[in-house]
C-alpha cells in the first residue's frame, strides 16, 4: 500500500470515529449488548426506517423478552404488534422460525460462532456482522447499501462501481474496521452515511474528508 492510499484510509477511519463521537444519532437499541435484542432488532429494521422501529421498540421487548416468548405467541398476534413497521406477516413468520431454531439448536441463546449465526434462518452477512460486532465485540464490517455508497464515493477508482457482493469491496471494508473500535466505526459510518454522505444531496461542505474524496473531486471539476 503506497503512502497516499494509506493516508486516505487513515483519514477515512479517523473521520468516521470523530463523527461518532460528536454527531451520532441515538436509538434505544444502541444502549444494549444483548445478543437477543440486537438480532431481533436487526430483523425489525429491515426495509423500514429506524424511526418506525423506535416507536414499537420498548413495547415489543417488554412483551417479548426472549425467544421463548416469540415462539409461544401466535404469528397473527406478533404481526399485529409490529404492524406499524410494515411487512408484519412476513416478519412475524421470520421471527417465529428464528426463535424455533435458536431454541431447538442452541438452547434459546444466540450462538457466538460466525458460521452458526449465518446459518440461522433469515440471517445474512450484514445481520451476522451486526451481531458479531454489536453484541460480541468482534471485529466485523457491517456492510450495507449505505456503507457501499460511502466507499464507492470516497475511494473511487476501482472501487467506484463495486456492488454489495463484490469480494474486493468486502475485503476493503474489513481492513478499514479498527481493532477495538468496531462498534464505534460501524455505527459512526451508518450515521455519517445518513447525515453527511446521503444518497441525494450529500453535504460535502460539512465532510471532514472531502479533500481526499474522489466523488467530491469529480463534482468540483
Curated annotation (Swiss-Prot):
Changing residue 187 to Q: Accelerates the A/G reaction and decreases activity on T/G and U/G. Changes substrate discrimination between T/G and A/G by a factor of 117 in favor of the latter. Its EC number is 3.2.2.-, 3.2.2.29. Changing residue 126 to S: Almost no activity. [4Fe-4S] cluster binds at residues 197, 204, 207, 213. Residues 105-133 form the HhH domain. Its cofactor is [4Fe-4S] cluster. Pfam families: HhH-GPD (PF00730). Transmembrane segments: none annotated. It catalyses: Hydrolyzes mismatched double-stranded DNA and polynucleotides, releasing free thymine. Changing residue 126 to F: 60-fold lower activity. It is an enzyme of class 3 (hydrolase). This is Thymine/uracil-DNA glycosylase. It comes from Methanothermobacter thermautotrophicus (Methanobacterium thermoformicicum).
Amino acid at each position: 500500500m503506497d503512502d497516499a492510499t494509506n493516508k486516505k484510509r487513515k483519514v477515512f477511519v479517523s473521520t468516521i470515529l470523530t463523527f461518532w463521537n460528536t454527531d451520532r444519532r441515538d436509538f434505544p437499541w444502541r444502549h444494549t449488548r444483548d445478543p437477543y435484542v440486537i438480532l431481533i432488532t436487526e430483523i425489525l429494521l429491515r426495509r423500514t426506517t429506524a424511526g418506525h422501529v423506535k416507536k414499537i421498540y420498548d413495547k415489543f421487548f417488554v412483551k417479548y423478552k426472549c425467544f421463548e416468548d416469540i415462539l409461544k405467541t401466535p404469528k397473527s398476534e406478533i404481526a399485529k404488534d409490529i404492524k406499524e413497521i410494515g411487512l408484519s406477516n412476513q416478519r412475524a413468520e421470520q421471527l417465529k422460525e428464528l426463535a424455533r431454531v435458536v431454541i431447538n439448536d442452541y438452547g434459546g441463546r444466540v450462538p457466538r460462532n460466525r458460521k452458526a449465526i449465518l446459518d440461522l434462518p433469515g440471517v445474512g452477512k450484514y445481520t451476522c456482522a451486526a451481531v458479531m460486532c454489536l453484541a460480541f465485540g468482534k471485529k466485523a464490517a457491517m456492510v450495507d447499501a449505505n456503507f457501499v455508497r460511502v466507499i464507492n464515493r470516497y475511494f473511487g477508482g476501482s472501487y467506484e462501481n463495486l456492488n454489495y457482493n463484490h469480494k474486493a469491496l468486502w475485503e476493503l471494508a474489513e481492513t478499514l474496521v479498527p481493532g477495538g473500535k468496531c462498534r464505534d466505526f460501524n455505527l459512526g459510518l451508518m450515521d455519517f452515511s445518513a447525515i453527511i454522505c446521503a444518497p441525494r444531496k450529500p453535504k460535502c461542505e460539512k465532510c471532514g474528508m472531502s479533500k481526499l474524496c474522489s466523488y467530491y473531486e469529480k463534482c468540483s471539476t
